[in-house]
Amino acid sequence: ASDVYKRQGEYNEALTMAENAIKGAEKEGYALWTNEEYPTAWGNDASASNPGEILFEIVNLTTDSPGKESMGYLNSYNGYDDMCITCSFYQLLKKDPKDVRLKILSFDKKYYAYVNKYQPQQGENITDANIPLIRLSEAYLNAAEAAVQTGDNAKAVKYLNSIVQRANPENSVEGKTLTLENVLDERRKELVAEGHRMYDVIRNGMTVKRIDVKDSDINKTKHNTAYMEYDWNFHKILLPIPQKEMDANPNMKQNPGYVD
């Protein structure tokens, strides 16, 4: 609910909903992964006694695996190489060499660098781990963003600091006046490969920029070079209405930029 209110610009309601989600989840035993837990928590299903921080997930069994269409296959040098990180993101993250999130990246000097959030764990060939959709970390970041937008710096610091210090206990935002950029940068680092960044940029009226830089740790990266920059006016932000739906309703108007 907090995410919906954010997209509507209703930040007071977004803050209330995010805080309610945090309180409700923690009352039920959910908690942010610790710095020590973070690198290996991915790919391991939670238990009733230790639910971790994943609030909503898609149940996934080995027999459910779509094989070469699975998330792990998209994110592997043995697969399609379609979910590799960019050099610009890597350079943002490695500004702090002690950031625990560096430990979920893997590098193949011959090819690309990957995020190991969806790959098989413990020597498995096919992952049977559930796929996380909503984490407690996201609720904290939603609360921090909404607090910045409503001018409540104390709450913004409270919620953002939990994520910052989990990434590196030596860091803190205590005593700082936080900006939207501070929160969005932390969202970019924490929620990488979870489907948020483009929407974070677009809903805040910013421009998506694919920055073409080099880094000695990464041999290759991928960009859609046809669209190096775009904003909320770009027609492909909205998908076309399927032709089947258009055929079923002659009064239906196709989304702008697509042929009726």
Task: Label every PLM stretch briefly.
Residues 3-73, 81-84, 94-260:
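Acidic/polar-rich alpha-helix caps and helix-coil junctions
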